[in-house]
Amino acid sequence: MSVKELIVNAGSSSLKYTVFRMPEQEVLANGIFEQLTTPKPTFTHKLPNESGKLVKVIEKEPLAPYATHADAINTLIETLTGKKFGVLSSMDEIAAVGHRVLHGGEKFSGSVLVTESVKEAIRECIPLGPLHNPANLMGIEVCEKIMKGIP
């Protein structure tokens, strides 16, 4: 049985994402929010064409000045479930959200289910990845808040 997963890579001023159909590893959509929290953030969204090649359907779409990661996640949900460029009928189709975290220190070398203790361990590793780990953690927390109930 196929499931859909949303993979998120939250950076200090960006948010990259891909929606996969698993276990086929089929890319249903991907994109990036760039220059978040600046005067001119943008959004690019790609969908596969008939041959499966990803093509830009939204390119460098301006967002509200100083848009946050939470704003980006909300725009992402609207886009993924929208009639024009959506690939989901609702977020209920997402079985899980995966997050890229730069540095897990000696605590993590592979995938884990995010719990409060995992988030605390990511915080403890901030000295190992001071630019990325705070943003990665913030991405996890924003997704948890906005996409309640999705692991």
Feature-to-residue mapping (PLM):
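Gly/Thr-rich phosphate-binding beta-strand-loop-beta motif of the actin/hexokinase/Hsp70
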Residues: S2-K46
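Short coil/turn connectors at secondary-structure junctions
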Residues: S2-V3, D92-E93, M147-P151
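Fold-independent oxyanion-binding glycine-rich loops
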Residues: A10-G11, R100-V101, N136
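General structural feature for long, well-ordered alpha-helical segments within catalytic domains
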Residues: L15, A72, L76, E93, ...
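Contiguous, glycine/small-aliphatic-enriched amphipathic segments in soluble metabolic enzymes
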Residues: V27-A95
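Short beta-strand-loop/turn "lid" adjacent to the catalytic site in phosphate-handling enzymes
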Residues: H69, L80, K84-L131
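Active-site neighborhood for divalent-cation/phosphate handling
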Residues: V118, I122-P151
